From Swiss-Prot:
Gene expressing this chain: ndk
Pfam families (UniProt xref): NDK
Protein's organism: Mycolicibacterium gilvum (strain PYR-GCK)
Keywords from the named record: ATP-binding, Cytoplasm, Kinase, Magnesium, Metal-binding, Nucleotide metabolism, Nucleotide-binding, Phosphoprotein, Transferase
GO function terms (MF aspect): ATP binding; metal ion binding; nucleoside diphosphate kinase activity
Name used for this protein in its record: Nucleoside diphosphate kinase
Cofactor: Mg(2+)
Binding locations of ATP: 10, 58, 86, 92, 104, 114
Length: 136
């Protein structure tokens, strides 16, 4: 089933100049990039994107990190795009859970600085795409 997902290359991925490497892996996986933009993330967008984590102990540091520098926001499309990208990204903890061959397993340094975000469900993808690409 063809679906869409939102992917963010987080500030650590942009700062470390890994955009090309990450996009190459996305394209090699067979996912199409239907929208892509380098963006500075404002507080309102960050809060809306991470609303499910509000009230958790790490919420403030999450907002601080995602607004610390530009991100690459992209919409990917393809068969089972959500699961396909999440498999490509690897576990959220790059050191302990992400396996070699994944973006985080090969390139990630620590849990908060784990390079990429990918939508985790069709509902999240729809909400996140509407937030980051309102006209799409």
């Amino acid at each position: 089933m063809t679906e869409r997902t939102l992917v963010l290359i987080k500030p650590d991925g942009v700062q470390r100049r890994l955009i090309g490497e990450i996009i190459s892996r996305i394209e090699a996986k067979g996912l199409a990039i239907v929208a892509l933009e380098l963006k500075n993330v404002g507080d309102d967008t960050a809060r809306a994107h991470y609303a499910e984590h509000e009230g958790k102990p790490f919420f403030a540091s999450l907002l601080e990190f995602i607004t610390s520098g530009p991100v690459v926001a992209a919409v990917l499309e393809g068969p089972r795009a959500i699961a396909a990208f999440r498999q490509l990204a690897g576990g959220t903890d790059p050191v302990e859970k992400a396996i070699p061959g994944t973006i985080r397993g090969d390139l990630g340094l620590e849990t908060q600085f784990n390079l990429v975000h990918g939508s985790d469900s069709p509902d999240s993808a729809a909400r996140e795409i509407a937030l980051w690409f309102p006209g799409l």
